[in-house]
């Protein structure tokens, strides 16, 4: 199994896009990229805009090879929108290049919050006749010796979160099993851990806690330790966690726990052999400003 990191906060953008290739299948997980419209009261820096364009180019290049594309949920950093956007590096035709003639394994709209349901409607209308959309919640598919499995609905953060629900995916080729668990924000709820326990992963990619919002990390740390106890060879911490320049200190207990148990912890940047580029987290520095405080609350992405 080949795992290629495409876009994520350690690579300078909001995303969790991964490309995975097995003997039988080429799958592009969550082919989206976006930038925070405001952070520290500032718009995206030109370096962030450049990185968004670069990541979008890589998404398009890999989409040309992919058989399957996933949509874990309808936040704009996890799918390609069907309209032009500078912050998502799209024009009016980009979505066709990503999804056209593909099988799209997508989150069902039946239990979405209002904003995700609205985005789903716009995308579903655009993809009619363009792609084969399969609502994936709880499903399983076999491609030769490769099995793709989707979780049931998981909370995007704490139970009852206003940001809605997501689904996770597992890809297994008989030798490796990748668990791709986006935007569970920790995981803060045990349901995401249960999915990992069920699929017995050798590699786990998980959306970590949004430490920059000042949340209580006790549940996230506990659940990350439970994932470590599954003894994957690799744990990739990603996304919301990497919006904090002090993320290593915030989850230091997990890093030490993983080291004692022989589980390697990495970021997308490390997997890509690149230096971390926490551009959003360093936006004030990029603009040469230090006086602006952190925003409160969680935005809808």
Curated annotation (Swiss-Prot):
Superkingdom: Archaea
Pfam families per UniProt: Lactamase_B_2 (PF12706)
Disulfide bonds: none
Cited SUPFAM superfamilies: Metallo-hydrolase/oxidoreductase
InterPro entries linked: Metallo-B-lactamas, RibonucZ/Hydroxyglut_hydro, UPF0173_UPF0282_UlaG_hydrolase, UPF0282_hydrls
Transmembrane stretches, start-end: none
Similarity comment: family membership: Belongs to the UPF0282 family.
Name assigned to this protein: UPF0282 protein Pcal_1546
Source species: Pyrobaculum calidifontis (strain DSM 21063 / JCM 11548 / VA1)
